[in-house]
Structure formats: structure tokens, C-alpha cells
């Protein structure tokens, strides 16, 4: 039985099931030691956590572990007894520290003395130090960020394929692999997915995920404390380096100097390097040319904004974890209206479900509109004009614009006209009377009827819902 996989799966379920503050306070620091004769041994990092798990979460742990392993288990909580156990127990994914060390070339200069060419051999480092560093490394990977949980679409298909290739064949496919794109598009998810994939296949591989800010802070602290050898142990005795937001080292000379030598050491030793940034290497101003050229040695892939189908798939996957049911019409509505990055998509869905829970009401399009009123008002004002709506509706349904605005009531014109009424009410500040004037001088009660009819039917008519979504997408893409 793979205890690492069992515990990671259990933690993933608990992270979805429990409120975030409860998960972080009580569960995150625990670690599965063994399952023997139907008893799961879970290690708590301190007595406070041990007591909390025993008094609050034994039943939940039994249920979740039993569900994962496929048979009933009892749970026993034990206390970590040493510093190394406490650090290991604090790891998010509960992976055990690797037992062997891998040697590589460690020749870069460091300050204190920085830049003096003096090398501090890693061979003098104690096994205990290496074990502690490995335990801390594993804590930096989020077990929920896996390839299985990554929603693939045209905007990120190449990036996903490149990351999978690197995970399956480290230092053979693309080295370095450089991912770039705007915030909230899944770059960090892919970095974690690589690390989790590699460690699931071989827990002995030394994987380190850090942000460039952490790298810089570690460097500064090591120089101040005269612990540059510790810094080398952390960053150069690894097999895979995953470094996030590399753009933040721009303009920091010492950090760039040290990362240059770290890069060279790892690359020359055949170790895999994966880097993310919010822009391409050429667009990172004040980045040293020697670093820029090294970033371009391997493969550079951009991650783009998700399209409508990908946004819908992301929201659908997120909705499956929601504490309240989220109907498909609401998912479609959010995917149409929130056309930014993935974090905002997920944040909006969380806000809608929280709003519904707070008022103890089901999730509907009306509830979503109320919960996101400020955001939707801001996003909507991409200056969609009434004239643009009428043109898009007429073009979509292949009807004459004059007929759409006229008094005729033929069957092929009634539905497009009602859709136009609905979109004019939803996407502009036009009053019902103004909408009526645009559509053949109709009164406000007729407009209200048409709007309400479409609002009701899109909840049950999938075809109509798709038609309205397509028109909205065209409007948003053409808005200035």
C-alpha cells in the first residue's frame, strides 16, 4: 500500500470538506505513518494538534481513510517526538524525507564571502541537515495541484503537454522549461503538478518548489547569518527545481548572480529546471543577458487566457466540490460574464455559493447576479451599446435588423426579439421604456414579458442557453 498516495488523497478530500481555517489549523500538519491490522497511525506535530484531532476529527478521519483504502479503519493519533519528525509532520502532502543524497557540483561563489570564489563543500554537511531540508521541501508542494485536476483547453494545451513531458522524463525533454503568462492562469498549478507527479512515481527524487521571492530571502538570510553552506545544501543538492515568478529577481544583482550559478550547477549535473514568469524572458527588463540566454536554452511556452469552453469546464469542476448544488445555467452564466483569469472565476463561484449559503437559498442566475453585482457591473461596462446588441442578435439569427426593430410578429422574429430585449436589459443601463422604443415602440410591459420569458427558458432550454451565451461571447469580444 502506498501510504503517501493514501494520505495525499485523504488530505485532498479533507481540504474540500473542511473550512480552510480548520484544515490549516488541525489537519495540515498531520502525517500518516502506517496502516496495520486495520489501524491507521497518524502523527501530530504537537500535543495541541493531537488533542484537537482526537476530540474533533477522529470520525471524519476514519470515514475518509476508509473511503480511500476501501476497508474500515480505526485511527490512532501519536505525537511527534523529535525536531525532524515535527518538520516532516508539517509537510502538506506527508511525504517522507528521502534517505539517500545525490551529489552534484557546487562551485558558485557566495557572499560572506560572496564573490570571493571560496567554495564550501557540501560533503561536510551532516546527514541530519539534508534530511531536514528534504522534509521542508516536500511541504512546499500542494497535493491538490495535479495534472488530473488541471483543466485543459486551447489556451493551455501546449503548456500542459510540455509539463507532462518534463515530469515523465526529467532533464531529457526540455531543460529548462519556461512557462509564462498572466496571473491566475494555472502556471503555479502546473509547477506543483510536475513535482507531485515525479514524487508519486519515485519518492526518493529531490524536488524543490520555491518562489523567486523565497529564493531571494533565503539568500539574504544566509549571507546575514553566515550560513551560505546551508543555502547551497538547500538549492544545489536537488534533482528538480521548480521556481515560480522568476520576474521578481530582475534588478536584484546578487540574487541574479547566485541564481546564475545555481542554474549552471544544476543544469551541468543533468538536473531539471522549470521556471514560471508573468512575461517572456525577452520582456523581463533589467534581467541579465546571461540569464536570459539560459532561460532560452530549452522550451518557452505561453499560457493564455481561457476561452469560453475552458472557463465552463473549470467552473464545472470547481462546482463539483461546492457545498451547495450549482446548476449548469449558473455555470454558463458565470463563464460568459467572467472573462478574466482562473482565480477570479473560482473566486466568483465561491462568492456565489457563500451568498446562497448565507441566505439559505438555492443557487440561481438571479442569486449569482446579486452576489456579484459590483463585479458584473464593472465587467459589463466594456461599453456594449444597444446598437451592438441589436446587430449581433440580428446577425446570429440571420434576420433583418429592420424586421427585428419593426412591429411584425412572425414566428422567426419573435424569439430573436425577446433575446434582444433580455440582453438589452442585462447588458446595458437602458430602461424598459427605452428598450421598447428601440424595438418598434413597444410598451414596458411587453418588454418585461419578453425579458422574463427568456430568463425563465434559459434555465430549462439548453439550446437557447447556448445561443444567448454565443451572442454574449461575440459582444464581449467585439466591445471596446
From Swiss-Prot:
| Region annotation Disordered: where it falls in the sequence | 91-115
Region: Domain III, AAA+ region; residue ranges are 140-356
Residues annotated for ATP binding in this entry: 184, 186-188
| Domain of life from the UniProt record | Bacteria
One GO CC term of this entry?
Answer: plasma membrane
What's this protein's name? Chromosomal replication initiator protein DnaA
Q: Which NCBIfam families match?
A: DnaA (TIGR00362)
Q: SUPFAM superfamilies, from UniProt?
A: P-loop containing nucleoside triphosphate hydrolases, TrpR-like
Q: Where is this region: Domain II?
A: 71-139
Please describe what this protein does. Plays an essential role in the initiation and regulation of chromosomal replication. ATP-DnaA binds to the origin of replication (oriC) to initiate formation of the DNA replication initiation complex once per cell cycle. Binds the DnaA box (a 9 base pair repeat at the origin) and separates the double-stranded (ds)DNA. Forms a right-handed helical filament on oriC DNA; dsDNA binds to the exterior of the filament while single-stranded (ss)DNA is stabiized in the filament's interior.
Q: Which gene encodes it?
A: dnaA
Q: How does it assemble?
A: Oligomerizes as a right-handed, spiral filament on DNA at oriC.
- Which regions are flagged for Basic and acidic residues bias? 97-108
Q: Which UniProt keywords apply?
A: ATP-binding, Cytoplasm, DNA replication, DNA-binding, Lipid-binding, Nucleotide-binding
Localization, per the record, is: Cytoplasm
Q: Which GO molecular function entries does the Swiss-Prot or TrEMBL record give?
A: ATP binding; ATP hydrolysis activity; DNA replication origin binding; lipid binding
Q: Which organism is it from?
A: Roseiflexus castenholzii (strain DSM 13941 / HLO8)
Entry annotated with the keyword 4Fe-4S: no
Q: Which HAMAP family match?
A: DnaA_bact
Q: Which SMART domains match?
A: AAA (SM00382), Bac_DnaA_C (SM00760)
Which GO terms fall under biological process for this protein?
A: DNA replication initiation; regulation of DNA replication
Q: Where is this region: Domain I, interacts with DnaA modulators?
A: 1-71
Q: Which family does it belong to?
A: Belongs to the DnaA family.
What the entry lists under PANTHER family is as follows: CHROMOSOMAL REPLICATION INITIATOR PROTEIN DNAA (PTHR30050:SF2)
The entry's free-text remark on domains says: Domain I is involved in oligomerization and binding regulators, domain II is flexibile and of varying length in different bacteria, domain III forms the AAA+ region, while domain IV binds dsDNA.
Amino acid at each position: 500500500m502506498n501510504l503517501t498516495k493514501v494520505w495525499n488523497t485523504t488530505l485532498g478530500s479533507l481540504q474540500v470538506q473542511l473550512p480552510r481555517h480548520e484544515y490549516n489549523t488541525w489537519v495540515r500538519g498531520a502525517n500518516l505513518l502506517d496502516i496495520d491490522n486495520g489501524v491507521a497511525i497518524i502523527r501530530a506535530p504537537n500535543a495541541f494538534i493531537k488533542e484537537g484531532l482526537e476530540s474533533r476529527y477522529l470520525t471524519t478521519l476514519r470515514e475518509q481513510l476508509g473511503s480511500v483504502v476501501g476497508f474500515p479503519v480505526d485511527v490512532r493519533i501519536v505525537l511527534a517526538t523529535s525536531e525532524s519528525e515535527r518538520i516532516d509532520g508539517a509537510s502538506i502532502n506527508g511525504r517522507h524525507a528521502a534517505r539517500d543524497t545525490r551529489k552534484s557540483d557546487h562551485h558558485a561563489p557566495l557572499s560572506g564571502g560572496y564573490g570571493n570564489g571560496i567554495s564550501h563543500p557540501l560533503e561536510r554537511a551532516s546527514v541530519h541537515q539534508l534530511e531536514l531540508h528534504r522534509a521542508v521541501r516536500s511541504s512546499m508542494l500542494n497535493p491538490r495541484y495535479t495534472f488530473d485536476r488541471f483543466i485543459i483547453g486551447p489556451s493551455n494545451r501546449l503548456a500542459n503537454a510540455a509539463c507532462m513531458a518534463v515530469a515523465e522524463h526529467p532533464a531529457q525533454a526540455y531543460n529548462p522549461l519556461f512557462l509564462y503568462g498572466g496571473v491566475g492562469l494555472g502556471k503555479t498549478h502546473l509547477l506543483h503538478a510536475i513535482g507531485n507527479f515525479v514524487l508519486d512515481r519515485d519518492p526518493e527524487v529531490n524536488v524543490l518548489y520555491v518562489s523567486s521571492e523565497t529564493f531571494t530571502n533565503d539568500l539574504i538570510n544566509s549571507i546575514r547569518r553566515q550560513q551560505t553552506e546551508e543555502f547551497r545544501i538547500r538549492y544545489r543538492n536537488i534533482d528538480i527545481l521548480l521556481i515560480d515568478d522568476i520576474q521578481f529577481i530582475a534588478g536584484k544583482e546578487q540574487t541574479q548572480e547566485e541564481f546564475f550559478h545555481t542554474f549552471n550547477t544544476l543544469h551541468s549535473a543533468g538536473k531539471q529546471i522549470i521556471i514560471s514568469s508573468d512575461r517572456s524572458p525577452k520582456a523581463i527588463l533589467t534581467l541579465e543577458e546571461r540569464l536570459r540566454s539560459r532561460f532560452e536554452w530549452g522550451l518557452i511556452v505561453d499560457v493564455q487566457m481561457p476561452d469560453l469552453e475552458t472557463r465552463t469546464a473549470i467552473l464545472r469542476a470547481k462546482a463539483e466540490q461546492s457545498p451547495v448544488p450549482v446548476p449548469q445555467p449558473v455555470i454558463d452564466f458565470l463563464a460568459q460574464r467572467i472573462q478574466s483569469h482562473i482565480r477570479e472565476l473560482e473566486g466568483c463561484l465561491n462568492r456565489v455559493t457563500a451568498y446562497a449559503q448565507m441566505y439559505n437559498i438555492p443557487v440561481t442566475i438571479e442569486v449569482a447576479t446579486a452576489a456579484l453585482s459590483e463585479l458584473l457591473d464593472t465587467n459589463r461596462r466594456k461599453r456594449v451599446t444597444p446598437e451592438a446588441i441589436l446587430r449581433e442578435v440580428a446577425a446570429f439569427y440571420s434576420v433583418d435588423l429592420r424586421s427585428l426593430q419593426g412591429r411584425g410578429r412572425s414566428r422567426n422574429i419573435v424569439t430573436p426579439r425577446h433575446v434582444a430585449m433580455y440582453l438589452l436589459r442585462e447588458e446595458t443601463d437602458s430602461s424598459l421604456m427605452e428598450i421598447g422604443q428601440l424595438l418598434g415602440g413597444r410598451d414596458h410591459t411587453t418588454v418585461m414579458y419578453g425579458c422574463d420569458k427568456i430568463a425563465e427558458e434559459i434555465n430549462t432550454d439548453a439550446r437557447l442557453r447556448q445561443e444567448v451565451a454565443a451572442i454574449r461571447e461575440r459582444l464581449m469580444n467585439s466591445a471596446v
